[in-house]
Every structure is written in C-alpha cells, then in structure tokens.
Amino acid sequence: MADITKEQVVSFIENMSVLELAELVKELEEKFGVSAAAPVAVAAAPGAAAGAAAAEEKDEFDVVLKSAGDKKINVIKVVRAATGLGLKEAKDMVDGAPQTIKEAMPKAEAEELKKQLEEAGAAVELK
C-alpha cells in the first residue's frame, strides 16, 4: 500500500469542490454498500428546542440557489467565481436548482454572495 498519511487525505478532501465531494460519497457508498445518511434521532420536546434556537443567533449560513431565473449564463459565472468549479460543474449546479452553492459561510460573506447571485438574476435563500 502507498505511504499516504491521513493528513494528506484530509488535505486532498479539503481542496475538493462540493460537487466532487458528492461524487466521492456516492462512489464510497456503492463500493462499500453503505449509506451516508444520518440516523434519525428521537424528536425532543418542540417547545424547548424552539426557545433555545431563537436565543442563539446563527453565525454560519448556507447559500441555496432556488432558481437561476432568465439570465442563467450570468448566474453560472457567479457560481463559478464563488465555488471555483469548472464551467460544466457550475452549469450542472445551476441547472439542478435548488442547490446549495456554499455551506457554513460567515454571515457577511453569505449575504454578499446572495447579493451577487440576485444581481445576476437568481432566486437565492440563506439557511
């Protein structure tokens, strides 16, 4: 077996795009016959969870592309710039809307990306 360290694997995965990571997960699921789906937990009391969630202000956001709108080419350009994806991958992401463009972004960066996508003609949501 090659002398590849865990750190090298982690470093390689860190540099992958969201689309590449999704493809990797699918391949691993097929190869090992497993599922990456999280197990469903027993639901807690809804009143307590809602109060705690409202008390905490969210500091990381996911930018979700709801639809590309009429100016799909402009939206693809913004997606490419934001994600570093190639043209085909960015087009597939835009065509597959709703799609998460970027995850766990700081609020200011997420709002800036949302603004850029909306200016390009897309419908965007922050989660």
Swiss-Prot record:
Keywords on record: Ribonucleoprotein, Ribosomal protein
Domain of life: Bacteria
GO terms under biological process: translation
Pfam families, per database record: Ribosomal_L12, Ribosomal_L12_N
Cellular component per GO, a single term: cytosolic large ribosomal subunit
GO MF: mRNA binding; structural constituent of ribosome
Functional description taken from the UniProt entry: Forms part of the ribosomal stalk which helps the ribosome interact with GTP-bound translation factors. Is thus essential for accurate translation.
Cited HAMAP family: Ribosomal_bL12
Family statement: Belongs to the bacterial ribosomal protein bL12 family.
Assembly and interaction partners: Homodimer. Part of the ribosomal stalk of the 50S ribosomal subunit. Forms a multimeric L10(L12)X complex, where L10 forms an elongated spine to which 2 to 4 L12 dimers bind in a sequential fashion. Binds GTP-bound translation factors.
Protein name: Large ribosomal subunit protein bL12
Gene label: rplL
